[in-house]
Amino acid sequence: MRILGIDPGLRVTGFGVIDVSGHRLAYVASGVIRTPTADLATRLGTIFQGVSTLVREHAPDQAAIEQVFVNVNPQSTLLLGQARGAAICGLVSGGLPVAEYTALQLKQAVVGYGRATKSQMQEMVTRLLNLTGQPGSDAADALGMAICHAHSGSTLGTIGAIGGLAPALAKKGLRVRRGRLVG
């Protein structure tokens, strides 16, 4: 199964594509869609077109996107919601089912700790996918979203606590201690 993860943003939208076979995760592609400094409609169109192109190029079976959180600034929340909507339209227009996860669920599934930092997310994504270099934070979050979806269902929320990722971490000489990755 191929999963496309999206980390929505008005200026930068991250994407990550992974293949899942049983418990094995394989990196396919990742990167960002950057919008031009332009009016809102142009930026949303860029996000929609970019996501639509990703769907055509990588032919994912499913997609996962981060839910919007209510920010201190309502205007920022509305803009993020619009960017997210443009990305969802690109996914749905390609015929994909779209799953949604909160940032807390994402971090819990990937790192085993719901309040993990961006650098912890990047490190875990790098290790789980055996990447030679560390992806940028937007691409790492999108790859993490795909990983989260791969581990969703009966295991979501229990991966760190019950050991869904513990064997993978142990093979890499890592473990989670007090919410932090330790070697």
From Swiss-Prot:
Q: Which domain of life is it from?
A: Bacteria
Single GO molecular function: DNA binding
Q: What is any Pfam family matched here? A: RuvC
Predominant cellular place of this UniProt entry's protein: cytoplasm
Q: What is the reaction catalyzed?
A: Endonucleolytic cleavage at a junction such as a reciprocal single-stranded crossover between two homologous DNA duplexes (Holliday junction)
Enzyme class, UniProt record, top EC level: hydrolase
Q: Which residues form the active site?
A: 7, 66, 138
Name the GO cellular-component terms. Answer: cytoplasm; Holliday junction resolvase complex
Gene3D superfamilies, per database record: Ribonuclease H-like superfamily/Ribonuclease H
Q: Where in the cell is it found?
A: Cytoplasm
Enumerate the cofactors the protein uses.
Answer: Mg(2+)
Cofactor: how bound: Binds 2 Mg(2+) ion per subunit.
The EC number of this protein is: 3.1.21.10
Which keywords describe this protein according to UniProt?
Cytoplasm, DNA damage, DNA recombination, DNA repair, DNA-binding, Endonuclease, Hydrolase, Magnesium, Metal-binding, Nuclease
Q: Where does Mg(2+) 2 bind?
A: 66
Q: Might you name a Gene Ontology BP term for this protein?
A: DNA repair
Q: Where does Mg(2+) 1 bind?
A: 7, 138
Similarity section? Belongs to the RuvC family.
Q: What does this protein do?
A: The RuvA-RuvB-RuvC complex processes Holliday junction (HJ) DNA during genetic recombination and DNA repair. Endonuclease that resolves HJ intermediates. Cleaves cruciform DNA by making single-stranded nicks across the HJ at symmetrical positions within the homologous arms, yielding a 5'-phosphate and a 3'-hydroxyl group; requires a central core of homology in the junction. The consensus cleavage sequence is 5'-(A/T)TT(C/G)-3'. Cleavage occurs on the 3'-side of the TT dinucleotide at the point of strand exchange.
- Record note on quaternary structure: Homodimer which binds Holliday junction (HJ) DNA. The HJ becomes 2-fold symmetrical on binding to RuvC with unstacked arms; it has a different conformation from HJ DNA in complex with RuvA. In the full resolvosome a probable DNA-RuvA(4)-RuvB(12)-RuvC(2) complex forms which resolves the HJ.
Q: What is this protein called?
A: Crossover junction endodeoxyribonuclease RuvC
Biological source species: Burkholderia ambifaria (strain ATCC BAA-244 / DSM 16087 / CCUG 44356 / LMG 19182 / AMMD)
Gene this chain is encoded by: ruvC
